[in-house]
Amino acid sequence: MANQTFAYVTDPAFVYGQGADMHSLNVLAAEIERTDIPVLLVGESGTGKDVYARLIHRLSGRGEASLAKINCAALDAGQLLNEVRAAFQFAGDVAEGETRTVFLDGVHELDAACQRVLLSLLPDGECKNGSAKPTSRVVSSTSCNFEKEIEAGRFRLELYFRINGVILRLPPLRDRKEDIPDLLECFLVKHSNELKKNTPELSREARKLLFAYDWPGNIRELSLIHI
């Protein structure tokens, strides 16, 4: 069921995986696809959090125009207030009665003032546009350890509880090296098609090097390989 659900993703390399961790991740994402429960995506940089946010939005049945991405690192409190309020309102290109997906990218980057603003807009983990019916689903992403951030007083516990209805943990590439050959083939085919060239084949020596490397940039780093 989950494999069929994820078969049409635009960039399947980020959600494909042979291991148990990726299977569990994809099954859980498929189970919550039609709900409005807040989702927190946790993973290192380059593990595909942005791709998963768009995937969750698409699987929810919401229209493409109703996805609003907010870069939390780039906003002060006033800007965040305007951005989030605008995202929570129905724009002209969103059908009447359709709920939006608001993607808070890098939510751990919010300072104390921004956290207060967001907390005031998420009274119970979802936004209600002046009515009892939710108008938006919130998906957040982070690359940090929230437990440490909360303990250090850098992130509000009550806000954490309101954005983590379900936590999806994206494993780093070094923990799923069995997927490297298939992931790389996907990217090489993509690059070759863009350049209108034949897809190259990897030598045995090249494969050994790929498996020996720890990939600190994760799948994003792998995707940049050109042969």
What name fits each language-model region?
Residues G48:
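Conserved glycine(s) of the Walker
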Residues G63-A86:
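AAA+/P-loop NTPase substrate/partner-engagement loops
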